[in-house]
Amino acid sequence: MDRMAVLARCRIFEGLTPKELQAIAGGAKERSVEAGETIAAEGEGGVGFFVVAEGKARVEREGEVLAHLNPGASFGEVALLDDRGNRRSASVIAETPVTMLAWSSWTFLALVKEHASLGFALATTLARMLNDAYAAHEHAAETPA
């Protein structure tokens, strides 16, 4: 697997230098699961961040499909900033065999300490995600039932 190519497709790493991407790639562990396997379970503790390298997965909350994850998609971003093992807000289920790059929050935070631009990229992405979620919530509240 070309880890650099996988990371280059991931939104959270946009704008990082090749040297920074190389450091991040070096801190990752590869994880593979079979189709139908739960990668992250809603309500369970989580302290890991993942980037889909190969395959497809879906995000579900209370049985409702919220999103589909293709190569380059990430999940578990909040766990990077909060290492208390907070509960996962949704489940991620492999639709095909999936290979991922994975980091524990501790490993990733050590990388952020070495590469400040990574911390800025993470903060920017999380702010965008919060803004998108807020906009979706506002739209849902305004839509008549």
Give residue ranges: language-model regions:
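Cyclic nucleotide-binding regulatory domains
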Residues: 12, 37-96
